Design a protein with these regions (language model features):
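Intrinsically disordered, low-complexity regions enriched in serine, threonine, proline
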Residues: 1, 9-10, 24, 37-39, ...
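N-terminal leader/linker segments that initiate helical-solenoid repeat arrays
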Residues: 2-42, 71-75
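N-terminal cationic leader/targeting segments used for protein routing and processing
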Residues: 6, 210, 214, 240, ...
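Helix-turn-helix repeat elements of alpha-solenoid scaffolds
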Residues: 15-22, 34, 49-63, 90-105, ...
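Amphipathic alpha-helical repeat scaffolds of TPR domains
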Residues: 36-46, 57, 71-88, 116-133, ...
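Flexible helix-coil transition and linker loops at the boundaries of alpha-helical arrays
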Residues: 63-74, 105-119, 151-165, 199-220, ...
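A generic structural signal for ordered secondary structure
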Residues: 78, 99-100, 105, 119, ...
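Eukaryotic alpha-helical solenoid repeat scaffolds
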Residues: 307-310, 315-316, 326-334, 345
Length: 345
């Protein structure tokens, strides 16, 4: 019989093994030469084989019996599984079997036992796991899980647990963002989903209940940018409606002006604000293709000339503006020149 302590010990050991695996991979990447690298690779293979055997034994003892139905959940064990998975997620651990499949099982259990808090937590976890996935249909699954939470918004006013209420609040954020990430809906539907979130965040009853716990105005600003800015950034002009662009211009324009107040040198602002705003102006016909490309190139040239590699303090290289130019912006410039070649003179 699997006990609460068994489950707690399982996740403690499983996390330890995941850490060990990450450390082995990290050491492999730090090899000084090919000979050392090959020796580390051989050691890694042996270690990973033993680790796999141990993990499989742990899963066979404490997880698979529940997934197969051989052992049934009860309230205590279900709550224990959920608590452990929440902690694992907060610590950055990911694993399909130990986390995703167990959470899917828990979701069904909490739904049947009418544990609304547990069910909402499970829907939130599953939405996040599938959003991070790359498999076919992962985006649709992620959106569906967050949508299920949104559809339970009336429960928000009945739930006393702040952690559960936050899952509902963040579902209104994640639902449109996931729709953008996986390009799942039309502009019209995306605006409807966005407005649904705005209505919830601006509901006086919501602000009265949790206005001291969350900054809803900041949440609205971030959501507007994440949806409008990122959708425009990843779309062709023909795929974006005028209504969407007009709203995007308002949001991106406000961010652009705010950055200019901090520093009048427009080339010093974050690249995502500068480039997305001008892309929006180009799509609206307020900036010619030639002006857009030349201004875009001037922005990139300024950064390449004034920001050597690693010069942005406190910023990881892959988040630096130089890295973004190399991997994103130069490609975007070439794409615009080719795709809109009749307009570039």
């Amino acid at each position: 019989m699997v006990s609460r302590k068994d489950i707690e010990d399982f996740y403690k050991k499983y996390k330890k093994n995941l850490d060990a695996e990450a450390q082995v991979i990290d050491r492999l990447l730090q090899a000084e030469d090919q000979e050392i690298w090959l020796e580390k690779l051989r050691k890694k293979a042996r270690f990973m084989r033993n680790l796999y055997i141990e993990n499989e034994a742990l899963l066979n003892l404490y997880v698979r019996p529940f997934l197969s139905g051989e052992v049934l959940l009860n309230d205590e064990l279900a709550d224990c599984f959920l608590h452990e998975i929440i902690d694992c997620r907060a610590e950055g651990y990911e694993d399909d079997l130990a986390f995703r499949e167990v959470t899917e099982l828990l979701n069904g259990y909490f739904r049947e036992t009418k544990n609304r808090g547990g069910e909402i937590w499970c829907l939130n976890i599953l939405g996040g796991l599938y959003n991070a996935g790359s498999g076919e249909g992962d985006g649709e699954r992620s959106k569906a899980y967050f949508q299920q939470i949104v559809e339970r918004k009336d429960l928000y006013f009945e739930i006393e647990d702040l952690g559960v209420r936050k899952r509902i609040i963040y579902a209104f954020y994640n639902h449109p963002v996931v729709s953008v990430n996986f390009r799942q809906v039309s502009c019209e539907e995306l605006l409807r989903i966005l407005d649904e979130a705005m209505d919830f965040y601006n509901d006086p009853r919501v602000r009265e209940k949790d206005g001291e716990n969350l900054d809803f105005d900041e949440l609205i600003d971030e959501l507007n940018y994440d949806v409008l800015g990122n959708y425009i950034c990843g779309s062709d002009r023909a795929d974006v409606t005028d209504e969407f662009l007009i709203r995007g211009e308002k949001v991106l324009g406000a961010l652009y002006e705010a950055e200019l107040k901090k520093n009048p040198n427009r080339f010093e602002m974050p690249d995502e604000i500068y480039c997305n705003y001008h892309r929006c102006l180009f799509f609206l016909g307020k900036m010619s293709c030639t002006d857009f490309v030349e201004d875009y190139w001037a922005f990139c040239s300024y950064i390449l000339e004034n920001e050597p590699l690693g010069s942005q303090k406190g910023v990881e290289f892959y988040d630096s503006r130089v890295f973004q130019i190399a991997t994103v912006h130069l490609t975007n410039i070439l794409y615009v020149i080719v795709h809109y070649n009749n307009e570039y003179h």
